[in-house]
């Protein structure tokens, strides 16, 4: 093996990682689409309804979407930190955002027999960056679908001169110790549960970009 030249350019690890994350994200997106297609097939042509295979396919879809969302969040956080994220707040209808997020989450909800509803006035508008807020809402929906028992509700309403988006489920909720930690929980990780706090950190960063005075 020839010796490394002193003039050889140094590897830009950040560029390498970004390129790798993009590649993984695209591959996971294709895998998620294939799994969604498999779950959408009629039972007589695809995976039998109520079979263990359907449940395992739904769980695989959840995990693929979860990892893909985390990669997208990492990319967005890096760009925000480096001040080159193309932040693009525009006035948009909240109902369209809700329907788009629900459409992405419905294959998993349907396969698990979970009822999903949304409550949002058609004339409710807000100023926000679509991709960032969509990512936060989708993350919340996926978490709700994972922990709920039977029902998830996505709602949006006018609130205090702005808008409020809420995702509710009938699961056990956050444990008391996590609620007591508040924002501090975003900074820690748990080897026991595998929780990195990335979703909460991302949501907090997105809220910070959508501030008006002391409101976000």
Describe each region flagged by the PLM.
Residues 30-49:
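Conserved C-terminal segment of the DHp
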Residues 62-70:
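Short alpha-helical segment of the dimerization/phosphotransfer core of two-component systems
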Residues 82-87, 125-128:
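Conserved micro-motifs of the catalytic ATP-binding
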Residues 88-91, 115-124:
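Conserved catalytic submotifs in the C-terminal HATPase_c
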Residues 151-161:
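Short beta-strand/loop element within the Bergerat-fold HATPase_c
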Residues 168-194:
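Glycine-rich/acidic phosphate-handling loop/turn and adjacent ATP-lid/helix
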Residues 202-215:
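Conserved glycine-/histidine-rich ATP-lid loop and adjacent helix of the Bergerat-fold HATPase_c
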């Amino acid at each position: 093996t020839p010796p490394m030249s002193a003039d050889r350019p140094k590897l830009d690890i950040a560029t390498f990682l970004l390129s790798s994350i993009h590649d993984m994200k695209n591959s996971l997106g294709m895998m998620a689409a294939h799994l969604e297609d498999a779950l959408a097939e009629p039972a007589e042509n695809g995976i039998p309804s109520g079979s263990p295979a359907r449940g395992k396919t739904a769980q695989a879809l959840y995990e693929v979407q979860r990892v893909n969302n985390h990669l997208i969040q990492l990319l967005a956080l890096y760009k925000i930190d480096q001040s080159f994220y193309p932040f693009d707040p525009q006035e948009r209808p909240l109902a369209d955002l809700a329907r788009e997020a629900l459409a992405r989450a419905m294959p998993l909800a349907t396969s698990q027999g979970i009822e999903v509803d949304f409550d949002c006035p058609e004339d409710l508008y807000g100023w926000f960056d679509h991709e960032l807020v969509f990512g936060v809402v989708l993350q919340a929906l996926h978490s709700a679908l994972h922990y709920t028992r039977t029902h998830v509700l996505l709602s949006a309403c006018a609130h205090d001169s702005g808008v409020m988006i809420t995702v509710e489920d009938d699961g056990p909720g956050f444990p008391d110790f996590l609620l007591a930690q508040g924002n501090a929980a975003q900074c820690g990780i748990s080897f026991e549960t595998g929780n990195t706090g990335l979703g909460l950190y991302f949501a907090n960063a997105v809220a910070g970009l959508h501030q008006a005075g002391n409101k976000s």
